[in-house]
Regions:
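Short, small/acidic-rich helices and loops at N termini and domain boundaries
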Residues: 1-86, 256, 350, 355-358, ...
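Glycine-biased, small-residue-rich flexible motifs in mid-sequence functional cores and linkers
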Residues: 2-5, 82-363
């Protein structure tokens, strides 16, 4: 994609009167944002803009310096993707209202990796935390990227677990993604770690105000980047349910973790299941529903045959983390023997050591 269309697209995106639908109209009508920026009022009207929007563009040309704005973005190490270019996420482009412009910090290639969204309440219980840790770990070791917001609670826990398991985290923000704008500030350090292994994403340019309505609008991107959306703990009015609604509208799978009928943060997830969301008790439920198990099995080297002891141990492992103490009790073998078998199986690519004595089966 030509640099000029990005420079002028970024400038147009700073005009508050132009939302994503109007920007997409300009892109489709003029084919590039540079031509749209230089267009006169008559052509802008033909592109479908209102008189108020046209006046806003005329006024913006007098106060905005597109090249200067672009240089500010480069200094903040922010990449920009325009709908239709090679690295723009293909799943997101399939949705009804894809953002014409995405700002990215980190690895843009991650945006086209197979991903599942994991969202939920800020008021996470211990049950929700454990569910997030175990299910996300199982997805990550099966080479699935995790998409979420950056809110504390389930969102942050999903991203932290992804990082702890050397996965690919994608955080979609409702604010600009330069360091001073990252929100919430309590997760600033988490955001920096995400940039190293995955990416931060937003449709908002530098200097954009963080408004309340940004958050539900942002949720369409979380769902749009993902093959499916998992909700772990959500009350009836939780924003996570908005993400699930977007996923349904985008014809994507919706998954939910059931919870106690006495827990307020399980009312939303239990209701989703009543409405037809797929009940999830482990990461395998998601892998199976998305028809990914066959793909995962072919990824490992099938030429390395296992011994009888190795096969015996593998039978007691699954796609969910199993602690070595539990494994030793199940297989009724000495600790040293089990440790040796696990080491060999990891070398063969059959299992993964998640740390903390936890192991998962890779195929």
């Amino acid at each position: 994609m030509e640099l000029e269309t990005k420079i002028y697209g970024n400038a147009l995106n700073q005009i508050a009167e132009l939302g994503p639908i109007s920007l997409m109209r300009l892109l489709k009508y003029f084919s590039d944002f540079e031509t749209a920026w230089n267009a006169g009022p008559k052509d802008l009207a033909l592109a479908g803009l209102s008189s108020k929007q046209i006046s806003a563009i005329v006024a913006a040309k007098a106060r905005l310096n597109p090249e200067h704005s672009w240089q500010q973005m480069e200094r903040a190490k922010i990449n920009m993707l325009v709908a239709g270019e090679k690295d723009y996420p293909s799943l997101l482009l399939e949705t009804a209202a894809p953002p014409p412009i995405l700002y990215v910090r980190g690895d843009v290639k991650v945006l086209n990796h197979l991903a599942v969204a994991v969202v939920g309440t800020r008021k996470m219980s211990l049950y929700g935390k454990r569910a997030a840790q175990e299910i996300v770990a199982g997805l990550v070791v099966n080479n699935i990227a995790i998409v979420s917001g950056l809110a504390y609670g389930i969102d942050a826990e999903a991203l932290i677990t992804t990082l702890n398991n050397q996965g690919r985290p994608i955080a979609v923000l409702a604010s600009p993604i330069d360091n001073p704008s990252i929100s919430p500030r309590v997760n600033y350090n988490l955001a920096q770690k995400i940039i190293e292994s995955g990416c931060l994403v937003s449709e908002y340019p530098l200097g954009a105000a963080v408004q309340k309505q940004n958050f539900p609008i942002r949720n369409r991107i979380i769902a749009g980047l993902s093959a499916g959306t998992l909700v772990i703990e959500a009350d009836i009015e939780s924003g996570a349910l908005i993400t699930a609604k977007y996923a349904l509208d985008q014809n994507r799978d919706v998954f939910a973790v059931p919870g106690s009928i006495f827990s307020p943060v399980s009312r939303g997830t239990n209701d989703l299941i009543k409405q037809g969301a797929k009940l999830v008790g482990s990461s395998f439920d998601i892998i199976e529903a998305l028809n990914l198990d066959g793909v995962i099995e072919t990824a490992a080297d099938l030429s390395l045959e296992e011994t009888e002891d190795e096969r015996f141990v593998i039978e007691y492992l699954s796609h969910e983390p199993t602690h070595i103490d539990d494994l030793i009790r199940r297989v009724n073998r000495q600790t040293g023997k089990v440790n040796a078998i696990l080491t060999v199986l990891e070398m063969k690519g059959r299992i993964k050591n998640l740390g903390g004595g936890n192991y998962v089966k890779l195929r």
